[in-house]
């Protein structure tokens, strides 16, 4: 049998083995406990990421749906606004017939005849005018892409080019402020260009349209030039005498548009007086010419456009008052090309007039001194030549006579002194009768008119073919009509107040 000491050792070994197994079991259990929470946390993180992604997707879908709904509402609103604009245009009469403005063939004495060509006619909305006459009209291009599409559809169809031109549409605000005074036409130089989205597409013309004309703008740049009916001689005269951009613009306006056309037109073609629109092609030509000659800015061009509108308003007021619309610089100018009713060209008529020198006689009862109008300077002074055909008579000693011309081209008769050098000085108005003749022979012995202040509004002398014409004047007596040696018929129309007489050629 085993001793007691051996049994104790066996028991200790067994207890030690049991403790060792228990420790291993604890370690395994601890390891299992530590692994299981780790796996659970990983599963929890994966589920949270999935839920966040799904939430973001749902939010994105909701936002897209709302944006689609807003876009649909905006489209409906746009269609509604477009319909309202069309109805408003219909009410305002903007979609009626095209506004047509006759062009001037360069003649200072009248508008273009029926045989001349009208280059460009545009309505008041955004339009396309191309060489083959586009069939569609765009009332309001919404984006730059649509404008580029319009240009691509029109440019390149013919040999001519289409240019984008902004046309002003502002109303004539100053019409309500006009008092009839000429000083009301002063233009403020502090104006700035206004934002204007109205765009007109026009087609530039070519040299074939006006073979005897000239180019406005840079003739070497096809996009910055316009062919106009102004003759090379007139264009040289304009370039020589016009030292500022504004003066050149207003001078070109007189050459391109007759004053009668200016009186019923403006740049926009709008206003309470129902005015027409000046030809945008020629207005663009003036713009190109000023940019080329003077290198002006857009601000300068805006002020010049104001001056052009002001000039048109001045012509309109003068027309309303019945005053002359004659241009001062054109008073002694013969049109270069103008067809007459009987087929005789203006060049032949000009040659006949040159060969037969004419003079207008201003007779101041019983004169012995004769002077002839030679030239009216820019300062308004009249330079005269002695031994001419201006008969001055019955002027009391110490009194004198002069003929002056105002800024609008009106000739006025005053008491003046005629010096030895041919210069005259203004004093006060005399009494006047007027006779026209082709020669300086034959004096005038007649009594004066009853008018105290005579204003010659418009005088144009033509070829004399009838030497038996009569002077028609209500204030002249029959005896006076019999005594006057008249070589050319002139109408003397005396106003109701008996103070103004208008002298005009028959048929003018």
UniProtKB/Swiss-Prot annotation:
GO terms for molecular function: DNA binding. Keywords: Cell cycle, Chromatin regulator, Coiled coil, DNA-binding, Nucleus, Repressor, Transcription, Transcription regulation. Pfam families: BEN (PF10523). Gene3D superfamilies: BEN domain. Residues 65-90 form a coiled coil. Residues 223-319 form the BEN domain. It is found in: Nucleus. SMART domains: BEN (SM01025). Residues 132-153, 168-198, 326-350 are annotated as: Disordered. InterPro entries: BANP, BEN_domain. GO terms for cellular component: nucleus. Residues 141-153, 180-198, 332-350 have a biased composition (Polar residues). Its main location: nucleus. DNA-binding protein which may repress cyclin D1 transcription by recruiting HDAC1 to its promoter, thereby diminishing H3K9ac, H3S10ph and H4K8ac levels. Promotes TP53 activation, which causes cell cycle arrest. Belongs to the BANP/SMAR1 family. This is Protein BANP. It comes from Danio rerio (Zebrafish).
């Amino acid at each position: 049998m085993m001793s007691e000491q051996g049994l104790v050792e066996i028991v200790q070994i067994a207890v030690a083995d049991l403790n060792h197994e228990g420790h291993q079991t604890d370690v395994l259990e601890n390891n299992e406990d530590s692994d299981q929470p780790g796996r659970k946390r990983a599963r929890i993180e994966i589920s949270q990421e999935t839920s966040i992604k799904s939430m973001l997707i749902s939010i994105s879908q909701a936002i897209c749906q709302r944006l689609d709904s807003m876009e649909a509402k905006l489209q409906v609103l746009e269609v509604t606004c477009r319909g309202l604009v069309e109805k408003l245009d219909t009410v305002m009469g903007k979609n009626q017939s095209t506004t047509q403005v006759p062009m001037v063939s360069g003649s200072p004495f009248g508008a273009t005849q029926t045989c001349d060509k009208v280059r460009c006619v545009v309505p008041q909305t955004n339009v396309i005018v191309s060489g083959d006459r586009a069939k569609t009209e765009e009332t309001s291009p919404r984006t730059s892409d649509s404008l580029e599409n319009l240009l691509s559809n029109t440019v390149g169809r013919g040999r001519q080019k289409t240019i984008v031109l902004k046309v002003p549409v502002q109303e004539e605000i100053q019409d309500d402020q006009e008092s009839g005074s000429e000083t009301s036409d002063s233009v403020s130089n502090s104006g700035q260009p206004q934002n204007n989205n109205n765009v007109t597409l026009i087609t530039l013309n070519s040299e074939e349209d006006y073979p005897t004309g000239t180019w406005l703008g840079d003739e070497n740049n096809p996009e910055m030039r316009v062919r106009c009916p102004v003759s090379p001689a007139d264009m040289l005269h304009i370039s020589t005498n016009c030292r500022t951009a504004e003066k050149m613009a207003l001078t070109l306006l007189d050459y391109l548009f007759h004053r009668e056309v200016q009186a019923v037109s403006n740049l926009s073609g709008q206003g309470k007086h129902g005015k027409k629109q000046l030809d945008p092609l020629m207005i663009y030509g003036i713009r190109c010419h000023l940019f080329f000659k003077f290198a002006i800015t857009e601000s300068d061009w805006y002020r010049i456009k104001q001056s052009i509108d002001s000039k048109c308003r001045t012509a309109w007021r003068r027309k309303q008052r019945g005053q002359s619309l004659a241009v001062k610089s054109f008073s002694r100018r013969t049109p270069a090309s103008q067809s007459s009713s009987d087929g005789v060209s203006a060049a032949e008529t000009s040659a006949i007039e040159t060969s037969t020198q004419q003079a207008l006689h201003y007779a101041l009862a019983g004169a012995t001194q004769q002077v002839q109008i030679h030239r009216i300077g820019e300062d308004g002074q009249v330079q005269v030549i002695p031994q001419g055909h201006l008969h001055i008579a019955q002027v009391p000693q110490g009194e004198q006579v002069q003929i002056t011309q105002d800024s609008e081209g009106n000739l006025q008769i005053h008491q003046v002194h005629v010096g030895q050098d041919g210069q005259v000085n203004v004093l006060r108005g005399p009494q006047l009768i007027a006779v026209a003749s082709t020669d300086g022979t034959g004096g005038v012995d007649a009594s004066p008119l009853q008018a105290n202040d005579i204003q010659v509004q418009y005088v144009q002398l033509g070829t004399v073919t009838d030497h038996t014409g009569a002077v028609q004047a209500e204030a002249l007596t029959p005896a006076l009509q019999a005594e006057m040696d008249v070589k050319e018929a002139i109408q003397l129309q005396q106003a109701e107040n008996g103070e103004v007489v208008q002298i005009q050629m028959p048929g003018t």
